[in-house]
Amino acid sequence: MEMQQNCSISCFWETQPLGCVKISCIFYHSKPRNINGLFLPPSSNITLQKESQEGIPLQTQSQEPLKPQENISRPIHHPLVLKTNFEEEEEVDEQNDASSLWTKTPEEIEEKRAIKEMCYKSGEYYRFHTPPDILSSKSMAPTAEKELEKPLENGSELQEGDSLTVPTKLSQYERQGEIKTSLHGKPKTDIAAFENGGGDCYVPQRVIFLGVDESEALTEEKEITISKCSNTKDNKDSPHPKRSLTTRLVPTTHVLNATENISMKCREDPSSMNDVQPVKKPHFKGVKKRKWIYDEPKNFPDSGMRRAVQTPSPQNKMSYHRNNKNRNAENASYIHVQRDAVRTVALNAPPHSRPMHGSYNKVHVNKEPKPNLSPDKYMSTSYNDSAWRKRIPFSKTYSKSGKIYPEPRRNGSK
């Protein structure tokens, strides 16, 4: 269109003396031009008309094919636009709901809420759920924990003397303390009763713990049954009931320290032998030490006695035997316990702390005859000594250990 309009405008350079020099000048030229030997005739109106006529059909031809294209491309219905951003749709819906709240009645609002709740419930139904077994176990777990906590708070359902009753819901530190303190009750079995004093006439005693971890105590302690080597042979001919005696091997320093405390208390106050008190050493860590204490006679020997446990005088034993046979049987069982306890001290004592011919031999032993007690009970001294040597290779025996319990004779002579 600009070319057609420009062709109707006369060229400015045509009025100049040199004329229009441009070959491709689009303006109207009334005069011919000669540009570098090229002759250009003047532009006429016919050409303008032709050009204008040619331009019009071109436009019509270009517009005609557009019409069928428009008819084809135009859809009958409005196009469906899909929105991928769902948040915007929700916001628009909320705005529409907010705008329509003013016009809706409360019944319609309640209906919409009910529909939304139903949709939410249906969505919850189709979601992933844990199986009911897990849910039931989760619900049962807190109830079981509560039931377990009740007897722990009351302390009534815990059995007396049962060392295996340990509360489950405790920390590791409290659990260790509970295991240690649970052994303070009365034992049920015969073996435990025999260790605590034996039979009906035992003194209730407490087990002493001196602050050792359970792992260390388990590694250090080795349980040895001596019933095969000592008690079975002794009890073959005796009418007393057979009872297996279990002893524990502990380090020598702990046994000696515990027995030294007992001997010091006996020296200061002889009546303290009948009292049951826990022995504690604050400056060392030890293992639990069971001590066997019985009713001692009031007449003690000379002050040179350093023994932890004394042998009872035979006169009192004979009176016990005459008065009560059961009491005499228990005292006879005490003899084995005391002899084994003293032997642990004598065998495990280090040489530099105890002299070879020390005060262990300074024991007041009444050598009067004992007709009612079988002498076979004293025969197990040498047999037990050899058994201790076999089972405890690191222990050192004394040459005069056999003189602690000499065999009494019928006539009373040595």
From Swiss-Prot:
InterPro entries: DUF5571, Znf-CCCH_3. It comes from the Eukaryota. Residues 136-168, 298-322, 350-382 are annotated as: Disordered. GO terms for biological process: poly(A)+ mRNA export from nucleus. Signal peptide: none annotated. Pfam families: DUF5571, zf-CCCH_3. This is Uncharacterized protein C12orf50 homolog. It comes from Macaca fascicularis (Crab-eating macaque).
